[in-house]
A protein has these predicted regions:
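Protein kinase catalytic-loop region centered on the HRD/HxD motif
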Residues: 174-186
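C-terminal lobe helix-coil module of Hanks-type protein kinase domains
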Residues: 230-322
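Activation-segment/catalytic-loop signature of the eukaryotic protein kinase fold
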Residues: 130-131
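AlphaC helix of the protein kinase catalytic domain
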Residues: 150-162
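Activation segment signature within eukaryotic-like protein kinase domains
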Residues: 170-171
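AlphaC helix of the eukaryotic protein kinase fold
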Residues: 83-119
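Conserved short submotifs of the Hanks-type protein kinase catalytic core
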Residues: 135-149, 153
Length: 375
């Protein structure tokens, strides 16, 4: 029997193509520095195909031969600092001066694994099973999550705009996960649609924490490579500026903006108090005013003007759902305001007419005693 290195199902080895997913046995990786499917790490994990990759790592589907379960395994691979030939599994430093920086990166990567592992009892945060050093790099073994990232999930909607009610519910679930993370003394630092998994029944899982990225931020590479424009608040662009849980709340506000507007919000550095971004309520006419206000508060340039914590963010979303009129949209607010103004104008006009007529009557009609004197 043969195990498919894409879906990890077992099938008869006489077939070259997996009958479950159609994967062709022996297919090489799309990018030459990715591990070849079938590679074994630590005499335990059989590496499969690539799930995703970025500037700091590659994530593969894998099979844990000891536990007999499908997993995801993330390899630390900072593009620009290392390379790997097709003949070896070991990573090679690109320049002797990068060794200290690279080792610091590995330390941060493994520290991230330990950080995530403390939340293994939580259902809305990815679970870590193992972490190890091998091939002159490091690996994190995590649960394999059936589902898709929010980034991918949004593509099913026209203009990638999610129904408001659904977006609010997902934002509440992310806020709940962030409340747990922050209570554990951790800041995620990388909340974005690509790090939020949508699972069955629209439950969510928070993925990659941003700790492993920090080592590069402290070194020489450009911040534009590290940060995700639109989701990173101003304080993340300044290396000495304090970051706290409000950093994640800005990002969550940006995620909510992305879900309801269909576009990534403007980069923080492009915004000023004098020329701020267009309010989401103007960009989407059926957006309730309270959602507009929540997004703008969460994405305030000054951290002091944002929600103080994730629970406060969630509470605001709950208040909006339960206490605001569902028809309270920006277009209807404008129409309502116009109607109120017109009513006030008419009332003032009627009052003016009443007093005008009364004054004229008093002026033109002589009192009875004056008529008698004149008679």
């Amino acid at each position: 029997m043969e195990r498919c290195l894409h879906c990890m199902e077992i099938y008869d080895e006489e077939y070259d193509v997996c009958p479950y997913c159609g994967f062709q046995r022996g297919t090489p990786p799309d990018i030459k520095y990715h591990l070849y499917p079938g590679t074994v790490i630590a005499d335990r994990y059989i590496v499969g195909t690539v799930i995703g990759h970025g500037g700091f790592g590659v994530t593969y589907v894998a099979w844990d031969t000891q536990l007999g379960i499908k997993t995801a395994i993330k390899e630390f691979y900072p593009v620009g600092l290392v390379s790997r030939s097709s003949q070896t599994m070991d990573l090679i430093h690109m320049g002797a001066d990068s060794d200290q920086e690279y080792q610091a990166g590995i330390d941060r990567f493994l520290a991230e694994a330990k950080t995530i592992a403390q939340f293994n009892k939580e259902s809305n945060i990815v679970h870590v099973y193992d972490y190890l050093r091998a091939n002159n790099t490091a690996y994190i073994v995590m649960e394999y999550i059936e589902g898709e990232t929010l980034e991918s999930y949004l593509k099913q909607y026209p203009e990638e705009k999610m129904p408001v009610e659904m977006a609010v519910e997902l934002a509440k679930k992310v806020a709940q996960a962030l409340a747990v993370i922050h209570a554990g003394g951790t800041i995620h630092r990388d909340i974005s649609p690509s790090n939020i998994m949508i699972c069955e029944n629209r439950e969510i899982k928070i993925l990659d924490f941003g700790a492993a990225r920090l080592f590069t931020a402290e070194k020489s590479q450009s911040l534009s490579v590290i940060l995700k424009p639109g989701y990173a608040p101003p304080e993340q662009y300044a290396s000495r500026t304090r970051q706290d849980e409000r950093t994640d709340l800005y990002a969550l506000g940006a995620v909510l903006y992305r879900m309801v507007i269909g576009k990534v919000p403007p980069e923080a550095l492009e915004r000023t108090k004098e020329h701020d971004m267009t309010r989401p309520g103007i960009l989407r006419q059926d957006l309730p005013s309270w959602v507009d206000r929540i997004i703008m508060k969460a994405m305030a340039l000054d951290p002091a003007e944002r929600f103080h914590n994730a629970s406060e963010f969630e509470e605001a979303l709950n208040r909006g759902v339960f206490f605001q009129k569902p028809e309270d949209t920006s277009s209807e607010r404008e129409e309502s305001a116009t109607n109120i103004i017109m009513i006030v104008v008419w009332i003032l006009l009627l009052i003016g007419i009443f007093y005008g007529v009364n004054w004229y009557t008093n002026l033109t009609v002589k009192p009875e005693w004056l008529i008698q004197l004149g008679g």
